[in-house]
């Protein structure tokens, strides 16, 4: 699954201008509820080895990395702590909210846990309302397949 995601992301980032390549400076923000796979995606895209845990609160500060295998462009991925809404209750949620609202990411990738879509959609609607382009990425599809 990570290979397919990485390949898709690289294909999305390819731009062609009359046969010539455009240089890009792009900053992606990985947002979503706690424990939905943001850090796993960050590691797959950047080649990093950030700690991943199967419980909320593992990522407590934002982490930045460059997309691996792309030497021509400056493509930064920002792994944000998990949030349920843009109304923060914890310091980690403040970090995420402040980045999303004040640091002008070019695109927000909203990772949604496919096993519990309803819980994730409140944040999705708030992210769309920011006016920043949002890509909704359903994650954990393998768990849905196992359920039948």
Residue ranges with predicted function:
Residues 68-72, 95-148:
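Conserved C-terminal guanine-recognition region of P-loop GTPase G domains, centered on the G4
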Residues 92:
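Conserved donor sugar-nucleotide recognition element shared by glycan-biosynthetic enzymes
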Residues 2-89, 103:
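Conserved G1/Walker A P-loop phosphate-binding module
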């Amino acid at each position: 699954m990570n290979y397919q995601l990485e390949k898709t992301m690289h294909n999305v980032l390819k731009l062609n201008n009359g046969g010539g390549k455009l240089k890009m400076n792009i900053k992606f923000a990985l947002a979503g509820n706690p424990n939905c796979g943001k850090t796993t995606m960050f590691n797959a895209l950047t080649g990093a080895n950030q700690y991943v845990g199967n419980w909320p609160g593992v990522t407590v500060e934002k982490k930045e990395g460059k997309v691996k295998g792309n030497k021509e462009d400056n493509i930064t991925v920002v792994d944000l702590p998990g949030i349920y809404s843009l109304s923060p209750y914890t310091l980690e949620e403040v970090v995420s909210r402040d980045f999303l609202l004040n640091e002008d990411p070019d695109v927000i990738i909203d990772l949604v846990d496919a096993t519990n879509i309803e819980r994730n959609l409140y944040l999705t609607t708030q992210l769309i309302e920011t006016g920043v382009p949002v890509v909704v990425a359903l994650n954990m599809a393998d768990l849905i397949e196992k359920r039948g």
